[in-house]
Amino acid sequence: MNKKILETLEFDKVKALFEPHLLTEQGLEQLRQLAPTAKADKIKQAFAEMKEMQALFVEQPHFTILSTKEIAGVCKRLEMGADLNIEEFLLLKRVLLASRELQSFYANLENVSLEELALWFEKLHDFPQLQGNLQAFNDAGFIENFASEELARIRRKIHDSESQVRDVLQDLLKQKAQMLTEGIVASRNGRQVLPVKNTYRNKIAGVVHDISASGNTVYIEPREVVKLSEEIASLRADERYEMLRILQEISERVRPHATEIANDAWIIGHLDLIRAKVRFIQERQAVVPQLSENQEIQLLHVCHPLVKNAVANDVHFGQDLTAIVITGPNTGGKTIMLKTLGLTQVMAQSGLPILADRGSRVGIFEEIFADIGDEQSIEQSLSTFSSHMTNIVDILGKVNQHSLLLLDELGAGTDPQEGAALAMAILEDLRLRQIKTMATTHYPELKAYGIETAFVQNASMEFDTATLRPTYRFMQGVPGRSNAFEIAKRLGLSEVIVGDASQQIDQDNDVNRIIEQLEEQTLESRKRLDNIREVEQENLKMNRALKKLYNELNREKETELNKAREQAAEIVDMALSESDQILKNLHSKSQLKPHEIIEAKAKLKKLAPEKVDLSKNKVLQKAKKKRAPKVGDDIVVLSYGQRGTLTSQLKDGRWEAQVGLIKMTLEEKEFDLVQAQQEKPVKKKQVNVVKRTSGRGPQARLDLRGKRYEEAMNELDIFIDQALLNNMAQVDIIHGIGTGVIREGVTKYLQRNKHVKSFGYAPQNAGGSGATIVTFKG
């Protein structure tokens, strides 16, 4: 796009509005190079980047980027084979640090969907080795001792020698105090010296480095430290040489990565520029517009970014509309409206946000041309007309259907009749060539052209006749009208004179009355539209607040869930530990009493997570209150899910119950009544138990074939408990022959169980030594 339009619209001043939000010199350089483009894909990419950055700020409102300096020259020096100095290495170090922080930020970013920005974040390089090398340079511009072993050795020797010098000088200060003008160690020519009285200069052997202006003090480096000082000077030279060697070595290590580091710096600057755009959006309530590829423009509440307290206006430049002609008197804001349209298009095509409301749409133009003169004096010279006409002639030779044309005070500066005719002819030529044009004029003849000509629309700037001031409101579809009579009357001109004047142009008055009615209708429509916008803004604010609250609640929910998971994991770990201890205690006892089995099972039940707190279930509490328990009622013991029967009630209100072979004492809250019509078998853990009936009474069978030893012993333990609680007299245990390990385990278990009356292998026709029949005590 031509540079002249950017100068006319003061685009550089607009770009300067974004500078305070930038953090890097790379971002600043990219902003300065920013220019409008007609490539739709690039504009869409810039718009998408801004929208994604806005979404990122919702989740990370304090997102920032480490400030960095320009390193393009540094990288070029590396590529040319030059070695870098400490200051240049610090610039590279800063860029690598900024890159690492951005990569870390992106890796930990959640709840944001990124596509365009993700491409930039993922292109950043990781240089852990180089970052380690560059740690040799601290921020004060000093090479650290750990940069090399040789440097550390040299500096240790320097430190030791300097300590010796200080010790010697301190001793001499004490010994020769009466010979010194001051009790301090001075420095001259980089050497440590004593301020000796001139009368004692021959009493202290050494090298004279200076004499005071009065001649009373001689600065002597004592002979005792001369050799040490020379040694220090030599070590300092070695130190400088070693530092140069380190700079050369690290330069060689960085050199192969110069291009990658330069690319990283550019990406950091690009992300910084996108961030600055969004900060501008937040500060100025700007928006990312929609993009129309058919030159349709719809600007809602658009403002000129450089005008303080600018009035917001709507501009609708539809696809079929060729020209908008703004008529009316000068000083009403016509030129500002013209510039606002042009500048908004330039900003959007440069990938910048615009000062307008949501729903605004911009077109794409290959070129924008303008003939805008800031001089709006009524008396314009012929030379001014010639200058403008020369410019217009040049523009007419360059514009095409892909151009936007802005013409200010078209035809001004010459005879009004001729000027109006020229203006209409130029507009007609542009209309026939289908070139989108916005033009301003104060010629009344162009009002009729706008009304009578297809694809051309009149517009004007509102004028408040009550205050005699322009309101700067853009009234599209309403031609401008003269307010001369109204203004003259309000300024005190005789009504007779005003009436006489109005009678001379009755026909024009009819037109003015029509225009006045149109203005009133437009104002009424604008008021309704403003009310609608206020409601939309309130809804938008509420929507943002609800979205923010929703995100916060989700984060809190996730935090609480994570805490709950951690607590649950701790509880499970504790439960497993306690259950292991209970099982160890059980297995360590050779004889178990019935109540110990029940207590152990109850403990294990309590370790299981409870899905429902039955004691707080109001429905169950009401159901229990319908009928009080009585002796003989069937119950379910809540602590471990076993069935039993109430046998008696104690004086303290507790109940005795028979649960299998065991008598238990229970509080009423520890059991539930089982209704006869609702009795169902209580679900227990499945352990391959198959009940059968025979003439010998109730029996059960446990099949342990194919089980691992620990699994088999665990199932056997549960099976025997259930058999005892269900008053079974006899059970069968099928363990197979195999290696005999499980069979031996079953035998040992049965031997130490005091409830087992007897056990032995089954008959040959019932499994032989592969099965064991167990009989319990009555």
UniProtKB/Swiss-Prot annotation:
Give residues annotated as binding ATP.
328-335
EC number(s) from the headed UniProt entry: 3.1.-.-, 3.6.4.-
Domain Smr, which positions? Answer: 702-777
What is the top-level taxon of the source organism? Bacteria
Record key words, sorted: ATP-binding, DNA-binding, Endonuclease, Hydrolase, Nuclease, Nucleotide-binding, RNA-binding, rRNA-binding
Q: Does the keyword Transferase apply?
A: no
Per the UniProt entry, what is one GO biological process?
A: mismatch repair
Q: Does the keyword Nucleotide-binding apply?
A: yes
Which top EC class applies here?
Answer: hydrolase
One GO molecular function term of this record is: ribosomal large subunit binding
Looking up NCBIfam families in the UniProt record yields: mutS2
How does this chain assemble?
Answer: Homodimer. Binds to stalled ribosomes, contacting rRNA.
HAMAP family according to UniProt: MutS2
Q: What does this protein do?
A: Endonuclease that is involved in the suppression of homologous recombination and thus may have a key role in the control of bacterial genetic diversity. Acts as a ribosome collision sensor, splitting the ribosome into its 2 subunits. Detects stalled/collided 70S ribosomes which it binds and splits by an ATP-hydrolysis driven conformational change. Acts upstream of the ribosome quality control system (RQC), a ribosome-associated complex that mediates the extraction of incompletely synthesized nascent chains from stalled ribosomes and their subsequent degradation. Probably generates substrates for RQC.
Q: Which family does it belong to?
A: Belongs to the DNA mismatch repair MutS family. MutS2 subfamily.
Q: What is this protein called?
A: Endonuclease MutS2
The gene from which this protein is expressed is: mutS2
